[in-house]
Regions:
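Non-catalytic, hydrophobic alpha-helical segments
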Residues: 75-76, 83
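Short C-terminal tail/terminal secondary-structure segment
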Residues: 81, 92-106
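Catalytic loop of short-chain dehydrogenase/reductase
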Residues: 1-20, 25-34, 46
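Short, small/polar-rich loop/turn modules that mediate ligand/substrate recognition or access, typified
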Residues: 33, 38, 91-93
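Catalytic Tyr-x(3-8)-Lys segment
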Residues: 55-74
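Conserved SDR Rossmann-fold cofactor-binding beta-strand/turn motif
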Residues: 38-48, 84, 97-99
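Conserved sequence/active-site signature of Rossmann-fold short-chain dehydrogenase/reductase
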Residues: 1-2, 46-48, 52, 101-103
């Protein structure tokens, strides 16, 4: 999830795309909420370590409060289940960051 090979270009391109998804989530929530439709997004942090250089994994873990990268197939499930469950009935227009706390220090 963290690798950028799917999104070629400079970091500004990545940031603009990310901001676009956040803005679209909020805009669609405002538009569709009156119809009872909730719109939220999940913003995953670094997931791996499959095929990632060990130095990258170690550096990422050192910069993350939870001390590790996200586990593929495990750490996004809770966020998805929450947003799909009645527990999120009063949540819309939100981007749920699942990054082990990485973004709080950035």
């Amino acid at each position: 999830m963290y690798q950028r090979n799917a999104m070629s270009g400079q970091p500004v391109d990545y940031a603009a795309a990310k901001a676009g998804v956040i803005g679209m989530t909020r805009d669609l929530a405002g538009l569709l909420s009156p119809m009872g439709i909730h719109v939220n997004a999940i913003a995953p942090g670094g997931f791996g370590p499959r095929e990632l250089p060990p130095d990258f994994v170690s550096d990422y873990a050192d910069r993350t409060p939870l001390g590790r990268m996200g586990r593929d197939g495990i750490d996004l499930k809770g966020a998805a289940l929450f947003l799909a469950s009645p527990a999120s009935d009063y949540v819309t227009g939100h981007t749920l960051v699942v990054d082990g706390g990485f973004s709080i220090w950035q």
